[in-house]
Curated annotation (Swiss-Prot):
Pfam families tied to this protein: QueF, QueF_N
UniProt lineage: Bacteria, Pseudomonadati, Pseudomonadota, Gammaproteobacteria, Enterobacterales
GO biological process: queuosine biosynthetic process; tRNA modification
Species: Yersinia enterocolitica serotype O:8 / biotype 1B (strain NCTC 13174 / 8081)
Gene: queF
Annotated active site: C189, D196
Assigned protein family: Belongs to the GTP cyclohydrolase I family. QueF type 2 subfamily.
Protein function: Catalyzes the NADPH-dependent reduction of 7-cyano-7-deazaguanine (preQ0) to 7-aminomethyl-7-deazaguanine (preQ1).
Binding site for substrate: I88, E89, S90, H228, E229
Disulfide cysteine pairs (residue numbers): none
Predominant place of localization: cytoplasm
Record-given protein name: NADPH-dependent 7-cyano-7-deazaguanine reductase
GO cellular component, one term: cytoplasm
GO MF entry, a single one: preQ1 synthase activity
Amino acid sequence: MSSYQDHKALAELTLGKPTAYCDHYDVTLLQAVPRSMNREPLGLYPDNLPFHGADIWTLYELSWLNSKGLPQVAIGEISLNADSVNLIESKSFKLYLNSFNQTVFTDWESVRTTLQQDLSACAQGEVSITLYRLDEMTHQPIANFSGECLDEQDLYIDSYEFNADYLQGAAGKNRVTESLVSHLLKSNCLITHQPDWGSVQISYSGPQINREALLRYLISFRHHNEFHEQCVERIFNDIMRFCQPETLSVYARYTRRGGLDINPWRSNTDFVPLTGRLARQ
């Protein structure tokens, strides 16, 4: 269980509570969660963050009415800077997007501008937004994380409780530059404990990380309760602490829920994330 499970910032969230669905625009549905809530226990503060990055959201259920009342549909891609004060709680984001359904917007740019203004204000940070017509996405291939997959190791696993100590002594003597991938990342929502399924890519330069230890560490998230963004920052922080690579990038892409997927990345180098959806997305 996360040490901040009962943090006061979580008390007013609609997440985990019965909720009425509104189909007319209502910005008050958006709810923020302070990033400091999980960062401070890790010793991370705005003036000493060891990474930069973003939370990339894909919006699959976005619709509104044009000026003639004709429904419009789009796929949205949103990138929220990791140095924003808050992350955006996903259920509230879903409810907020639902409020567009019977709302008239004069054009697509009005929708994009509204999203940008509202999300920036909620997160207190920089947000970039792209809206795609469906025919722009039709030929987008299923992407795949580049790197060597950890998942075929023949391991006996008997513990699924989070334990960063799996990384103790995991840094070897040889120095390498490599990318490692696992599709076995599974954690649980901090509030509802619903499962969150993801794939993670870890790219680094430095002492070679023991692959068995790294996979055991990632599997130990299986009963861990934390938001997607927080899990990625925890992985980054633990690898830096135990393995001390010179460069590190951690990028996770999670399966969608409620028409949204969340894909956080954190890096201390010039990492550029792919944005194509993976097989399970």
